[in-house]
Amino acid sequence: MEENPDLLEAYAKLNIARLERREAKDALEWLADEYRHLWPLAPEKLLGAANADKGTRSGDAECDIIGRFMLRDTSVLTKRLAAKFRQLNPTACFVVMSPEDAQERLERAKTYVPKGRTEKALAAKRALKERYIAESEHQLVLAREYRAETTRLRIAAGVDQAKRRVSDAETAVSDACRDISQAAAFTPEGLRIKAEAIKASGIFEAFKGSGGIMAEISSFVQSVINVAPKLANAA
């Protein structure tokens, strides 16, 4: 019995899409390597909380040109981090203050109303306000400069286009996997193709090494991929 031509056509599309996805991802990685020496570290005065890659503010974390979290050497951040934290965390990813955050901080500093029971206390609070305003203005300048430079480099490198290429390739893989799942299989080779498409979709990646029904299904799919060629040869 011959295999379903629709299934074979969809499988050919999957192989083309997977090749394009791999090449697109390689091209994106190449950009990261090519621009690593040009990509600036955020000024230390803009750094916020540590472990930004693990918390709820990962969207504000310091990243490289393609959006991967950047880990800094904490041993040099003696004024910012306690010795114990530096010992336990040799590297860490930090939140970076955006121009919007810096502008908001500046507005808070400007609207702060100094209060004090004595003239001396009031004078101290006024001086504190002026210092906060000056620091916030400096942070705003730094944040705008950092945003401008990183944006310039992303545009020069064509990062958005490279990411769009990866996204388009992922969509093509998903479309091919869907077409394969909807086509009937007539032979053991067809079963292998369908199982391979399920694996290629990435749906089971999160369940590797875990228990439960999804892990069992993932194991079954891999078994089909392994056994189907033997069945085809035996036939």
Where are these regions (language model features)?
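Surface-exposed polar/charged interaction patches
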Residues: 20, 34, 38-41, 72, ...
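Long, amphipathic, charge-rich alpha-helical segments that form helical bundles/coiled-coils
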Residues: 65-96, 129-136, 140, 145, ...
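Charged, low-complexity eukaryotic segments
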Residues: 4-15, 90-100, 106-149, 153
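Extended aliphatic helical segments
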Residues: 76, 95-96, 113, 141, ...
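Contiguous, amphipathic alpha-helical segments that mediate oligomerization or scaffolding
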Residues: 2-57, 133, 137-186
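Extended alpha-helical coiled-coil "stalk/arm" regions
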Residues: 27-127
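C-terminal or late-domain output modules
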Residues: 1, 162-235
